[in-house]
Amino acid sequence: PDHNYYTLVTMGMGAHRMTVPPNFEGENFDRAELVICLPPDWPINSNSDIWFWPVKWLKVMARLPGEQNTWLAWGHTVSNNEPFAENTKLSGMIVSNMTDFDEGADKCILPNGECINFYQIIPLYREEIEFKVSHSKDELIHMLDGIDPVVDLNRPSQCVSESKKKFAIPSE
């Protein structure tokens, strides 16, 4: 295989138009499908909460635009407000560009010319979502650049919380 991981993709989210803000109408942001990548040793058929949460959150994110009359696109984040499962501290998702995929994998042009965008969702830590809120989605995406797009329950956070920083007091 070209990639040594599972690639899960929604099917049907793009059949429904999302409600995009007026300033984005006509920009082909109204249809999308979502992708999440799991490591090859992930127990993909397990229904246990510690393993099923990526599938659950793929579904949650896919249903969100229709249920909330909203839209999802690059840089949007959704928080769970608590860790997804007891085996990780990851607690939110960011909608990102497709990484580690061939050029053109991020779009599907339908026979009628309409476009369905494909976005990857990547799990985040609470402090990474807080960073986006206090800074910007562009800064968070830049900070996440280079992380493996495959879910890693224990990947290091890309943020260092102020309360966790260790400051030295200069000696006199």
Regions found by a protein language model. Give the residues of each.
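Acidic, proline/glycine-rich low-complexity IDRs
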Residues: 1-21, 25-30, 34-172
